[in-house]
Every structure is written in C-alpha cells, then in structure tokens.
Amino acid sequence: MYREANKERISEVKKAYREANKEKILDQQNIYTKQRRKSDPLYRLTLTYRRSCHRAFQSISQKKNVKSLKLLGLETWEELSKYFESQFYDHPKTGEKMTFDNHGRYGWHIDHIIPLSTAETEEDIIKLCHYTNLQPMWAEQNLSKSNKILDK
C-alpha cells in the first residue's frame, strides 16, 4: 500500500499544509466548534468542564497533564450528564426547568461546591475537579455565590 510505504513523506506533506494554512484551519475549527456547541449539549458540557479545570491548573502555574474524565472520576461524559440530570431543579423565580438545552451563560452553570479558587496545589485541584464536587446551579445564583462555600 502507498500509505504504508510512504508514511514519512505523507507526514511531511501534511505538516507543510498545516503550516501554510494555519489561519484557514483555525477558522474551520472555530466554525465547527461553534456549531457543535450549539447543537450538541454533551459537547458543550465537556468543553465547559475542560476549560474550568484547565484554568484552575493555570491559576497555580501548573500544566494540566491529566485527562478530564480521569479528573472527574468517571468513565464517560454520559455519566456526568446523568449525574447532573439527577440534580436538576426548577428555577426558584420563574419555574423554568433545567435541561441541557439551557446550560450556559443565561441558563444554568456547572458549580464547584468547594470553589476551584480555593486550590493551592495540584492535589487540591484534582480533588476539587471530581464530579462529587460539582452541581448544576442557575446562572444568577452561581454568579452571586462567586467563590464562596455555601451551607446546605
């Protein structure tokens, strides 16, 4: 087969293409991500979680070298969505129901019960990124909670 016999050559050609077309590729990736975020609630959930953990590691000048699912302590992203679904509650003022379609800026957020901002070490972040430290919370409640630990 041509591919097997020319692995290095193919790799070089692909690398050269990526170098020559960085902006075009980045634009395509951004369009894809934006569209998929809108149409796939589980994808949006995974990106949100990954970003929060990545930022937490950055805040203590560490690099995130652990897979997000391993940090969560789960096998699949579907397990996380089921965990959140089991905790969904109606909006206290409007009665709106939590769904994966209203997850985000104006709907509900992923709240860390013990805030990531309390982490001082890599071990702290690993503990705080575990799924048992997460809960769905309406955006305005989460924004007013900020980095506090609430009594139950």
Identify what each model region corresponds to.
Residues 144-152:
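Short metal-binding segments enriched for Cys and/or His
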Residues 89-90, 116, 144:
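Short, charged/polar surface micro-motifs in flexible loops or helix N-caps
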Residues 1-109:
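Contiguous alpha-helical segments
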Residues 96-136, 147:
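Histidine-centered nuclease catalytic patch
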